[in-house]
C-alpha cells in the first residue's frame, strides 16, 4: 500500500560529511537537530541525503525534490571556504536549488557553512527569477553546535510562514529577527580569514526576495539585527 503523507511543509537537508575529528566516521550530523524542529512543528516532514561533490549533490537534490509542499526549505550543511560549499561552488548550489524552486515550492535556502555569507552579491543574483524568498549563511567560520542551533531556530520560524508572509519585506525581516532573538549578537560565532574573532551580528547574513512584481533580492542583515535589538528587554 502506498503511504500517504499529510504534512504541509518540508525541510530538505543536503549534508556533506563533517569529519570533525579523526574518528568521526559520518557520526556528526545536523539531522537529529532538524528532526526536532519537525517534531515541534508537527506538520513538517524532514528529508535527508548526503553529498560529496557536484554530481552527488544533484542526485541528492533530485532524490529529495519528489513532492510539492505548501512551504519547502532547503538546508545545505557542509564545510565551506571562500566560494565553495564542500567541493561545490555557491553559485552552482543556489542555481540548482533555484531551478527546482517553482516546481517544488522551495521558498528558502539555509546554508550552514563557513564563509558563504560573504557572497551576498551571489545570493542576490541567483535568487532573482526563482521562487526562493530568502537565503542565509555565515561570512566567517561558525562553531558547529552553536551554528546548528541558530540554523534550526531560523528553519523553525521560516518554515512556519505562509505564502502571504513573503509579500512584505518588513514582515520577513521581523521573522528573521524573532528567530535569532534568543542568541547574543555579540557572541563570537567564529573567525575571519585572518583568524580574528567575528561576532554573530557581523557574520550571519540574510538576503530576501519578497514575492510580488518588481521586488528584487537584497541583503537585509543590518535591518534584521536592528529589529532583533528592539525585541530585547
What annotation goes with each model-predicted range?
Residues 77, 112, 138:
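Conserved residues at the C-terminal ends of beta-strands
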Residues 34-45, 99-107, 128-138:
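Structural alpha-beta junctions
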Residues 18-22, 52-56, 79-85, 115-119, ...:
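Short acidic, S/G/P-rich loop/turn micro-motifs used as interaction or catalytic elements
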Residues 1-73, 108, 112:
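A domain-level signal for caspase-like cysteine endopeptidase catalytic cores
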Residues 72-82, 134:
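Active-site microenvironments of hydrolase-like enzyme catalytic domains
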Residues 79-108:
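A short, glycine/acidic-enriched catalytic loop
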Residues 60-64, 90-100, 120-125:
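Short, charged beta->alpha transition segments
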Residues 116-232:
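Active-site-proximal C-terminal subdomain of hydrolase catalytic domains
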